[in-house]
Swiss-Prot record:
Coiled coil residues, start to end: none
Annotated ranges, domain GRAM: 138-215
Subunit-level organization: Interacts with AFH1.
Gene encoding the protein: FIP1
Pfam families: GRAM
Skewed-composition ranges (Basic and acidic residues): 1-11
Protein name: GEM-like protein 1
InterPro entries the record matches: GEM-like, GRAM, PH-like_dom_sf
Biased composition (Low complexity): 13-30
Domain of life: Eukaryota
Stored Gene3D superfamilies: Pleckstrin-homology domain (PH domain)/Phosphotyrosine-binding domain (PTB) (2.30.29.30)
The species this protein was found in: Arabidopsis thaliana
């Protein structure tokens, strides 16, 4: 499928994270799927609950959602991530002690995942990647199929709620779409093999129906944004560093492009 045609229908084809991909069997059974089949409960998930320690996703959630598009990653990617976590673990631990003195959403963003240190390291790694590759605009266009005149408007570090747990990544808002990509690849099974894939969501701007901010009744510092497509698929985002700005930008996108 071409990039432009896919954007019109809310679907994009996955783009490999590396030149090489795992070899696939020559023949498959009739119920074969390249990644776990969708769980109907994940199409319209309930409002997120407070996330217990250790709940962040490391495996690919089962999705039937037309806006979800996994993107294969090399098998050794997670090994590199683990090596980085090991090398930077002590530095991250020291940094998070100082982070306790910081107010507002950034600390809440770090606490959304199972490990403050891991979240901090992921943010550092993501920032390094952005700098190395020439900024968010270039990373956005490398990660997603974009139209020639498409411009990136905003980016937000956040988590996406899934049936497998919250997924840490970056939300991208452009002139043509709302998109999300995980910072790290998630694992999934293909036969006996464990493979890795980045978790991506793409909603064309003209498919946005509503954006609803909400706050947890249990802990008012837990804030969420519910995004609904015109065909009633729901996505719950949380752990924003700049929550108010994200709400404002998303609601403006609905007003500009929505039905």
């Amino acid at each position: 499928m071409s990039g432009q045609e896919n954007h019109d229908h809310g679907r994009i084809s996955s783009t490999p994270a590396a030149a090489s991909e795992p070899s696939k069997a020559a023949a498959h059974s009739s119920d074969y799927a390249p990644y776990p089949k969708l769980d109907p409960t994940d199409v319209t998930p309930p409002p997120p609950q407070p996330i217990p320690t250790g709940a962040a996703a490391t495996t690919m959630p089962a999705e039937s959602n037309p806006y979800v598009s996994p993107s294969p990653a090399p098998r050794n990617t997670m090994d590199s991530v683990k090596d980085t976590l090991g090398k930077w673990g002590k530095m991250a631990a020291d940094a998070t002690k100082k982070a306790e003195d910081l107010a507002g959403n950034f600390w809440q963003h770090l606490k959304t995942g199972p490990s403050v240190a891991d979240a901090a390291v992921s943010r550092i790694a993501q920032g390094t990647k952005i700098l190395a590759e020439g900024g968010y605009e270039k990373v956005f266009k490398q990660t997603f199929d974009c139209l020639p005149d498409e411009k990136l408007l905003k980016t937000y570090a956040c988590y996406l709620s899934t049936s497998a747990g919250p997924v840490l990544g970056v939300m991208y808002l452009s002139t043509h779409k709302l998109a999300f990509s995980s910072d790290n690849p998630l694992s999934y099974k293909e036969g006996e093999q464990t493979l890795w894939s980045y978790y991506k969501v793409v909603l064309p701007a003209n498919q946005l129906k509503a954006v609803n901010p909400s706050t947890s009744r249990v802990n008012t510092s837990d804030k969420y944004i519910q995004v609904i497509s015109i065909d009633n698929h729901e996505f719950w985002f949380m752990g924003f560093v700049t929550y108010e700005s994200a709400v404002k930008s998303l609601q403006e996108a609905v007003q500009s492009h929505g039905p």
